[in-house]
């Protein structure tokens, strides 16, 4: 019975503040839409892969050892891809359109565990640039590693052509997140309003807050 009364009271409070519950989420939604579509710059990500591959051989035992050795080299090669030497060469390959430090901030290097694959991911504000830069990293790396490591065991597995996708801003996530944030803010506002606003506004408040019957009311005259 007590819980039913509490639920009824909550329902009444929400109904009284229905405008706030509608206006604040919509306001947050509109602000998020403006920021997402007109303020934030789009980001595109392109991906390419290079393979640390074994040398040719007929001995299965030798080939297995070579594969294991190449897997162990992957971490070293990942660091080489991010090194100043590679960044400088990529910058030159792109006619110095991007500085080495800028290229470094656009670059992400990953690899799947226990594989010989290195994934090169590049984020840029332009779709074509993302693909072009990713391809440049793959090309430069495959040329420079034999000079650095004295091992010619790197090849380009897949180019970035046609792989660029928009990764930011996340329109749906931003809009839904803003709507629910507005809803939470509205509920918090209503909660504090109920807690701290003790003003009596109508006959119903007199009966509830003071426990006194209302005998009559005075009309408001202009």
From Swiss-Prot:
A cellular component term from Gene Ontology for this protein is: plasma membrane
Q: Which domain of life is it from?
A: Bacteria
> Does the record's keyword annotation contain ATP-binding?
no
Q: Name one GO biological process term.
A: polysaccharide transport
* Keyword set, alphabetical order: Capsule biogenesis/degradation, Cell membrane, Exopolysaccharide synthesis, Membrane, Transmembrane, Transmembrane helix, Virulence
User: Which Gene Ontology molecular function entries are recorded, alphabetically?
Assistant: carbohydrate:proton symporter activity; protein tyrosine kinase activity
Please report a single Pfam family linked to this protein.
Answer: Wzz
Compartment list: Cell membrane
State the annotated membrane topology for this chain.
Answer: Multi-pass membrane protein
List residues traversing the bilayer: 20-40, 172-192
Which family does the record claim for this protein? Belongs to the CpsC/CapA family.
Q: Which PANTHER family does UniProt cross-reference here?
A: FERRIC ENTEROBACTIN TRANSPORT PROTEIN FEPE, TYROSINE-PROTEIN KINASE
State what this protein does. Required for the biosynthesis of type 8 capsular polysaccharide (Cap8/CP8). Might act as the chain-length regulator.
Q: Give the protein name, as stated in the record.
A: Capsular polysaccharide type 8 biosynthesis protein cap8A
Q: Which gene encodes it?
A: cap8A
């Amino acid at each position: 019975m007590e819980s039913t009364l509490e639920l009824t009271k909550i329902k009444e409070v929400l109904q009284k503040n229905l405008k706030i519950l509608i206006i604040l989420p919509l306001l947050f939604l509109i602000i998020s839409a403006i920021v997402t579509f007109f303020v934030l710059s789009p980001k595109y990500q392109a991906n390419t892969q290079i393979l640390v591959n074994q040398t040719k051989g007929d001995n299965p035992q030798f080939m297995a050892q070579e594969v294991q050795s190449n897997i162990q080299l992957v971490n070293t090669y990942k660091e080489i891809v991010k090194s100043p030497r590679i960044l400088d060469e990529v910058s030159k390959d792109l006619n110095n359109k991007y500085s080495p430090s800028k290229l470094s901030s656009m670059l992400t290097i990953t690899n799947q565990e226990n594989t010989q694959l290195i994934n090169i991911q590049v984020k840029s504000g332009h779709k074509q640039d993302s693909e072009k830069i990713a391809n440049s990293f793959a090309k430069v790396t495959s040329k420079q590693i034999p000079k650095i490591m004295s091992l010619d065991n790197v090849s380009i597995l897949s180019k970035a052509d046609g792989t660029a996708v928009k990764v930011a801003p996340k329109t749906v996530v931003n809009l839904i997140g803003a709507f629910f944030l507005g809803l939470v803010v509205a509920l918090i506002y209503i909660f504090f309003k109920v807690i701290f606003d003790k003003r009596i506004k109508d006959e119903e408040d007199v009966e509830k807050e003071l426990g006194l019957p209302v005998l009559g009311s005075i009309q408001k005259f202009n």
